[in-house]
UniProtKB/Swiss-Prot annotation:
GO terms for molecular function: adenosylhomocysteinase activity. The lineage of its organism: Bacteria, Pseudomonadati, Chlorobiota, Chlorobiia, Chlorobiales. This is Adenosylhomocysteinase. CDD domains: SAHH (cd00401). Its EC number is 3.13.2.1. GO terms for cellular component: cytosol.
Length: 471
């Protein structure tokens, strides 16, 4: 399962799956034109040569194509998943067989998860990474929290707020006991992080506002070719895939409550309506609520919708949007799942600790909870990402958009010197990512004349929209 060296070479579930993984990677490459075009553009140049990149992002077939793109561009890469259930074991095995250090398997414990995250931050010779590809911000969090502990070791004595925090602090305690300046040394060499998802971006902006951010960050999530494609069209396909693989439920005729109507919520609501469900949306934002209403969705509070829904989908990036009290009031056989990043959108820990409910595992990532009054609910993927825990995540083509942005962000951070702040990729690069994906869809762009370009005040080659344009 492992190979020992100065640092661990890999830890995956089953190396015999590598050939299967390689076959699927070959198929995915044909569906990821942005990444393949980036490889071709920089062939032989190795613009990431010398860069040590730590990746904390779902270890899927699509991510394997990203990893091998970064390696082809010259980087030294170590990888772990950012979710205990999202790894595709055949993908991890294929990457390990290719000689790339990877620490990921489906069904990690929280202790194992944070151990894996620690491994990607430990390169040969005791060095840390120069760059991070993050999804949810956990690798970035580990460095920042470790840095704080080195300043104030009493933080290690505080009582953990939950079981995940306990697992993280155990790893940080071990690091501190081995080297009390480890994270200061790591931070000193960091060139930056590119962050994939809404939750991680929120963390970055919060750290920047508190003047705690230790290195530059690029917000990949808010690139148009990420948020308006991965979050919207990706969720539109992968949500239903996860729910159906887990439960075989017929969605048509059911009432589906979608909590949140951002880009992920929009894609989720469209998916469920397309299957014939009646969709109720909950929202805190009046603009998003108005959008949902104008699309024909009922918009109501969770307290009102809780007794109507057959299926509940959280998409908010916030915590406690489905509480234990909500679950007590739900219809019998209600299905609950999350397609936001963390499991704290649903009060999973209070549910597991509640003496008035009996838990029965049906199959991996499907648990039935029966309450004292006899009604039962089904929780998918333990409240973590249903599309990756119960299925295989977004399709390759839409992930090519996101991962091309990630690659460009890594190139930006490595080849340029950024001051500490949170940045977005320039509009011109956003348009270039879209352009790379048009030919495969048979799209033919109209070309402006010089007079037309001058009339609307844009360059012939773009960008064609101002930074504030919302698409």
């Amino acid at each position: 399962m492992t190979i020992e060296a100065e640092v661990l070479a890999y830890k995956v579930a089953d190396m015999s799956l590598a050939e299967w993984g390689r076959k699927e990677i070959d198929i995915a490459e044909k569906e990821m034109p942005g990444l393949m075009a980036t490889r071709k553009k920089y062939a032989g140049q190795k613009p990431l040569k010398g860069a040590r990149i730590a990746g904390s992002l779902h270890m899927t077939i699509q991510t394997a194509v990203l990893i091998e793109t970064l390696v082809e561009l010259g980087a030294d890469v170590r990888w772990a998943s950012c979710n205990i259930f999202s790894t595709q074991d055949h993908a991890a095995a294929a990457i390990a067989k290719a000689g790339i250090p990877v620490f990921a398997w489906k069904g990690e414990t929280l202790d194992e998860y944070w151990w894996c995250t620690r491994q990607i931050l430990e390169f040969e010779g005791g060095k840390g990474p120069h760059l991070i590809v993050d999804d949810g911000g956990d690798a970035t969090l580990m460095i920042h929290l470790g840095y704080k502990i080195e300043i104030d070791p009493s933080l290690l004595d505080k009582t953990p707020g939950n079981i995940e925090e306990k697992a993280l602090f155990q790893q940080l305690r071990e690091v501190y006991e081995e080297d009390s300046q480890r994270w200061h040394n790591v931070a000193a060499e960091m060139k930056g992080v590119s962050e994939e998802t809404t939750t991680g971006v929120h963390r970055l902006y919060q750290m920047m506002e508190k003047e705690e951010l230790l290195f530059p960050a690029i917000n990949v999530n808010d690139s148009v070719t990420k948020s308006k494609f991965d979050n919207l069209y990706g969720c539109r396909e992968s949500l239903a895939d996860g729910i159906k693989r887990a439960t075989d439920v017929m969605v048509a005729g059911k009432v589906v409550v979608v909590l949140g109507y951002g880009d992920v919520g929009k894609g989720s609501a469209r998916s469920m309506r397309a299957y014939g469900a009646r969709v109720i949306v909950t929202e805190i934002d009046p603009i998003c609520a108005l959008q949902a209403a104008m699309e024909g969705y009922e918009v109501n509070t969770m307290d009102e919708a809780v007794t109507e829904g057959n299926i509940f989908v959280t998409t908010t990036g916030n915590k406690d949007v489905i509480t234990l009290e909500h679950m007590k009031k739900m219809k019998g056989e209600a299905i609950i799942c999350n397609i936001g990043h963390f499991d704290n959108e649903i009060q999973v820990e209070p549910l597991n600790n509640y003496a008035g409910a009996t838990k029965l595992n049906i199959k991996p990532q499907v648990d039935k909870y029966t309450f004292e009054d006899g009604h039962a609910i089904y929780l998918l993927a333990e409240g973590r990402l249903v599309n990756l825990g119960c299925a295989t995540g977004h399709p390759s083509f839409v992930m090519s958009n996101s991962f091309t942005n990630q690659t460009l962000a890594q190139l930006e951070l490595w080849t340029r010197d950024y001051a500490i702040d949170v940045y977005r990729l320039p509009k011109q690069l956003d348009e270039e990512v879209a352009r790379l994906h048009l030919e495969q869809l048979g799209v033919k762009l109209t070309t402006l004349t010089n007079e037309q370009a001058e009339y609307i005040g844009v360059p012939l080659e773009g960008p064609y929209k101002p930074e504030h344009y919302r698409y």
